[in-house]
């Protein structure tokens, strides 16, 4: 429902007063635990997580033909080995478990944030109304790669940059452009790619080949500017393939590609906001010394639940999938978390996660058993008029989809600016081992929020740090050689905070001047992130 700016401001003021008085007698957080028994190490549904309980009806299309079943020609099985052959951050949150928040170690005894460089971006007209897409949006994480000398020789990187020890930042932003920058000083390493569609989500680089996947979050103002996904050759910046636009197999009319895909066995897996999950074989090869692809085995999974509609509990996925063995896990705008066998594209189990789920899950292996941690925004479930309600954060058994525990936070939301959890959590290591850390927006008041750390085993809140401005940006963490953690958390007020992981104490803050919805990428002591204020920042910890 569209509302005027004046009405939204009035409601925010009213909610501010209501939430102030509610704090006098209402619990703003609560914990629910469930009887959970670890069974056999087999992925399967239970009575509570059967797809039929969510009213799921699914269809498959393979190479343009609807089919009842499918078996992948080259089966996928993901080991515990590193996801990427590159040094750097090649997908949202770094890898297939979405726990690769940074690359390399930071230096010890450094605790101050410093702006090293900035790069201006521009704006792009929206496909509806009179507004513009500006800066870097949600999730908006840059990619960072340190190329080898041989790789640089094959690329159209500027000759002066080929002579240096180059670490390249590749950043797709909401002005429809892809920027290629030197992480040291922000200087351009090659020409900008101008696609002309807004990139709200995060791109992805193939983990062993110089291929770049781009997914716009919306269409443009012209008829031909419809949203679809792209694959580019990073050696020469040529577009190799596009897919997903105006797909007749889709149930939902809207289309976008905020999700950051994963690549395995020459296959790509990409969920879309049109409600489809795409998978196809790249058949990547060199032809006349030039990298190209010849996609085939093109598979689309379509489904809907008993509550799916164009008006509420939408189909479509904005989060990025995680993978364990041959299973893909993804949540959707309609509050459904799915486990899918990647080799049959069959939905194995489905769990109700209540509300619009935008933050990506993180996968944790605990004593050999896989678990998922994921939170939701407050979109469909708040009270009708004041838009208040509990927003859940879940620990879920990845084998059968059953709840282990749920931690709720009481939040506010307004049209277009959701409260709750929009981010993806940190799964701690070293000195923050056994902690799951994430921000909650619009609690305990309208414009503020908190960063919280929970015990992964019990859901108990270990620490909570108040934030004067709420955060959609996902936190990143890095460790020094001794295993001491520092967290970087950006917020809607344009602040970047440096936070001690063990107790949540803010030890430094830095203003970047405008709302930071995007998630930073971190390599060593260097951090890169864009703001809605049409700037990309290079920041270092000193």
Predicted regions: what they are:
Residues 83-106:
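Predominantly extracellular/luminal regions of secreted and cell-surface proteins
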Residues 4-78, 99-138, 143-214, 218-257, ...:
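Extracytoplasmic/lumenal domain signature
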């Amino acid at each position: 429902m569209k509302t005027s700016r004046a009405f939204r401001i009035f409601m925010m003021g009213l909610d501010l007063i209501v939430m102030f008085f509610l704090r006098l007698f209402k619990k703003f957080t609560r914990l629910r635990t469930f009887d959970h028994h670890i069974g056999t190490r087999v992925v399967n549904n239970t009575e509570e997580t059967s797809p039929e309980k969510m009213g799921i009806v699914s269809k498959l299309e393979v190479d343009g033909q609807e089919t009842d079943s499918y078996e992948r020609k080259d089966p996928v099985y993901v080991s515990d080995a590193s996801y990427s052959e590159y040094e750097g951050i090649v997908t949202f949150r770094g890898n297939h478990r979405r726990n690769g928040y940074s690359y390399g170690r930071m230096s010890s005894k450094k605790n101050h944030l410093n702006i090293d460089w900035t790069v201006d971006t521009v704006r792009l007209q929206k496909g509806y109304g009179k507004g513009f897409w500006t800066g870097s949006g949600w999730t908006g994480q840059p990619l960072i790669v340190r190329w080898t000398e041989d790789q640089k020789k094959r690329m159209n990187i500027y000759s002066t940059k080929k002579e240096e020890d180059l670490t390249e930042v590749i950043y797709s932003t909401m002005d429809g452009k892809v920027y290629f920058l030197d992480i040291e000083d922000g200087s351009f390493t090659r020409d900008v790619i101008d696609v002309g569609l807004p990139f709200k989500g995060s791109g992805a680089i193939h983990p062993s080949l110089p291929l770049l996947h781009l997914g716009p979050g919306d269409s443009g103002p012209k008829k031909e500017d419809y949203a679809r996904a792209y694959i580019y050759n990073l050696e020469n910046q040529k577009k190799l393939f596009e897919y997903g636009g105006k797909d007749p197999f889709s149930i939902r009319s809207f289309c976008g590609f905020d999700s950051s895909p994963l690549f395995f066995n020459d296959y790509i897996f990409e969920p879309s906001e049109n409600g489809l999950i795409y998978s196809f074989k790249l058949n990547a090869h060199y032809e006349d010394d030039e990298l190209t692809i010849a996609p085939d085995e093109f598979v689309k999974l379509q489904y809907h639940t008993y509550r799916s509609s164009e008006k509420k509990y939408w189909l479509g996925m904005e989060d990025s999938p995680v993978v364990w063995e041959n299973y893909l896990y993804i949540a959707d705008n309609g509050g459904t978390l799915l486990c899918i066998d990647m080799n049959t594209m069959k939905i194995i189990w489905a769990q109700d996660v209540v509300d619009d789920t935008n933050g990506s899950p993180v996968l944790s292996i605990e004593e050999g058993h896989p678990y998922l941690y994921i939170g939701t925004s407050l979109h469909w479930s708040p009270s009708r008029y004041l838009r208040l309600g509990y927003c859940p954060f879940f620990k879920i058994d990845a084998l059968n989809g059953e709840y282990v525990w749920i931690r709720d936070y009481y939040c506010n939301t307004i049209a277009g600016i959701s409260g709750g959890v929009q981010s993806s959590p940190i799964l701690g290591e070293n000195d923050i081992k056994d902690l799951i850390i994430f921000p909650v927006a619009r609690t305990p008041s309208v414009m503020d929020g908190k960063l919280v750390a929970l015990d992964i085993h019990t859901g108990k809140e270990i620490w909570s740090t108040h934030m004067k401005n709420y955060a959609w940006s996902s936190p990143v963490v890095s460790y020094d050689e001794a295993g001491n953690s520092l967290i970087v958390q950006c917020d809607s007020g344009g602040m970047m905070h440096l936070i001690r992981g063990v107790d949540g104490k803010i030890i430094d803050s830095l203003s970047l001047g405008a709302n930071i919805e995007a998630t930073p990428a971190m390599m060593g002591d260097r951090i890169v992130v864009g703001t809605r204020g049409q700037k990309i920042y290079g920041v270092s910890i000193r």
